């Protein structure tokens, strides 16, 4: 009897232990099947950002200790895109190095899915589902086994890797903190449903850079539609400054589309370098502005920072979440640092006769307290008498507070008999300029009350008016505000 009671207690304790283990989920490795994971997770080091020194292996606890994984710091997970060579591209170590320079104590993990990424594009695109699943299982393992907070996890995916990051975020048991999509791939994803591509629901915050969205939506290298909480389109999301369009077209004509990977690389990959720029040049953040269309942005109608209408590009983006996707635009330089300074210019052209000219070339020069920027070219699609025109210009240097500007109307590159018989000229009294970066507005006056602006003639000079008008009539101000808000709203 004593033996029987003892055996009963032992059996009862065993059952109780099993129940407790099952309820607490204390053995996640028993519940997870890591055998199907083909992606590799390389924990890069600051000393060797271009080398796969140590791999973290899901299900193997000792790999975390062997690779010196920091359990108390941020973790960046970098996911590359489609590859022709089957090798890492040169941007990978550059991004790793920049992340460590900004966050020295962090963990920077590079996801290696090169074998799957080297297939024909449609095949590799389909593999993003499996890669996303691999990454999700890896993240869940870290969270469940070590109670690693997913608030410390930031996924960064380029091209196809952006969609793999989105799928991973949708599959984790708890949401990761942030996903940054670096020009997410367009083909096969432009019209895809949210579960199989990057979407705002995949993380607490999703920000996206679109740098190569040329052509029809189904043929655009980068996805055109907004897929995050904030979607930023540098230079309209089209061809990027410094990327030689003429050379690309020449190579296409000579070699066809066999080398398309190299031809589109410059603009497509610019998304990565813009993010790297935000890591390295913390003191020179690029500013983006909310706008409905790039056409409205080109007119300078969206340089407002009211109610979160402007934001930093890249790492230090302000996390603004709205009910709808927020589209933002900005201009950049051709190389690092990419920051420029945006200005809206408004001019009213007075004329005795009703004259309209199209596609007119102009030059504007700005002079300020810190520097100057001369002969900035811009083209007005239309110039008409007795009408106000607004347009966007930008400078690559910080001019400081504006003091003076010059405006010149260039001659056409072709000869026009009408210009010879009836030379065109307008009268300008004032020029209004608004800075996007400082939000300051300045009104410039002609020294003589009004200045003649003639085609091919000398530049008209305007200086800062002695008395800056506060505002127009209240009704007019409200109307102007409503018009700008219509363009800026997302």
UniProtKB/Swiss-Prot annotation:
Glycans are attached at residues 70, 354, 386. Heparin binds at residues 430-441. This is Lipoprotein lipase. The keyword Transcription does not apply. Residues 480-490 have a biased composition (Basic and acidic residues). Residues 32-53, 443-467 are annotated as: Interaction with GPIHBP1. The lineage of its organism: Eukaryota, Metazoa, Chordata, Craniata, Vertebrata. It catalyses: a triacylglycerol + H2O = a diacylglycerol + a fatty acid + H(+); a 1,2-diacyl-sn-glycero-3-phosphocholine + H2O = a 2-acyl-sn-glycero-3-phosphocholine + a fatty acid + H(+); 1,2,3-tri-(9Z-octadecenoyl)-glycerol + H2O = di-(9Z)-octadecenoylglycerol + (9Z)-octadecenoate + H(+); 1,2-di-(9Z-octadecenoyl)-sn-glycero-3-phosphocholine + H2O = (9Z-octadecenoyl)-sn-glycero-3-phosphocholine + (9Z)-octadecenoate + H(+). One of its GO terms (cellular component) is plasma membrane. Residues 1-25 form the signal peptide. Ca(2+) binds at residues 194, 197, 199, 202. It is found in: Cell membrane; Secreted; Secreted, Extracellular space, Extracellular matrix. The modification 3'-nitrotyrosine is found at residues 121, 191, 343. The keyword Lipid metabolism applies. Residues 417-421 are annotated as: Important for interaction with lipoprotein particles. Residues 471-490 are annotated as: Disordered. Homodimer. Interacts with GPIHBP1 with 1:1 stoichiometry. Interacts with APOC2; the interaction activates LPL activity in the presence of lipids. Interaction with heparan sulfate proteoglycans is required to protect LPL against loss of activity. Associates with lipoprotein particles in blood plasma. Interacts with LMF1 and SEL1L; interaction with SEL1L is required to prevent aggregation of newly synthesized LPL in the endoplasmic reticulum (ER), and for normal export of LPL from the ER to the extracellular space. GO terms for biological process: cholesterol homeostasis; chylomicron remodeling; fatty acid biosynthetic process; fatty acid metabolic process; high-density lipoprotein particle remodeling; low-density lipoprotein particle mediated signaling; positive regulation of adipose tissue development; positive regulation of chemokine production. It comes from Gallus gallus (Chicken). Its main location: membrane. Changing residue 307 to Q: Some loss of heparin-binding ability. Changing residue 440 to N: No change in heparin-binding activity nor in specific enzymatic activity. Reduced heparin-binding activity and decreased specific enzymatic activity.
